[in-house]
């Protein structure tokens, strides 16, 4: 399940650097999208790539793409339902 991130909620862009996006919502919450790419520990040719979602400085969820040699291997989503509830409240 992919949680839709509606950027219309963003009131202003606070910071944009590299692939990290940080913005403030209409009600003053800070949302951060942080890109990551790391080698997978158990297989040298695998990389874990994706975005981490932070709300008000707390890690809430991440979307992962498992890649090898630049090709998509499989994808998964790890989240907790608080993220859905808090974004709806924004």
Please place each PLM-identified region on the residue numbering:
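Mixed-charge, Lys/Arg-rich low-complexity intrinsically disordered regions
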Residues: 1-19
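Intrinsically disordered, low-complexity repeat segments enriched in small/polar residues
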Residues: 6, 28-30, 70-71
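Tryptophan-anchored aromatic micro-motifs
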Residues: 22-26
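Solvent-exposed strand-loop boundary residues in beta-sheet-rich modules
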Residues: 27-29, 56-57
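Short beta-strand-centered aromatic/proline hotspots
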Residues: 30-40
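Lectin-like carbohydrate-binding module/patch detector with strong preference for beta-trefoil
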Residues: 39-44, 71-74
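Intrinsically disordered, low-complexity, charged/polar segments
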Residues: 53-90
């Amino acid at each position: 399940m992919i949680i839709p991130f509606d950027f219309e909620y963003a009131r202003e862009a606070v910071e944009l650097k590299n692939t990290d996006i940080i913005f403030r919502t209409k009600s003053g919450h800070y949302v951060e999208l942080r890109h990551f790419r790391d080698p997978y520990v158990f297989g040298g040719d695998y990389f874990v790539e994706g975005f981490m979602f932070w709300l008000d400085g707390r890690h809430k969820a991440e979307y992962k793409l498992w890649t090898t040699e630049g090709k998509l291997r499989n994808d998964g989503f790890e989240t907790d339902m608080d993220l859905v509830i808090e974004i709806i409240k924004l």
